[in-house]
Amino acid sequence: NSVQELAIIRDIHVGMRDCSNPVVYFTVDMLFGSSLQIIEDIPAFIRETGCYKLEDLEGKACVVEKTSDWMIEYVCLKK
């Protein structure tokens, strides 16, 4: 059973993965913890968020899905 929760986006960056592909990565802070999120499809992420300056996402509310005690996945911005 998966559960959706609200979270806050913190420390958003663009970087390179070990396979030389650019990614967006950030931390989501939830009521009882934090999780590092890595977004590989940057164009889709920009379209979904409508945000071209990634620093504008700092502090924004988002929805995450908790599929287990150790797996948390970004879903979308809270609208």
Predicted regions and their residues:
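Short beta-rich binding modules
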Residues: 1-79
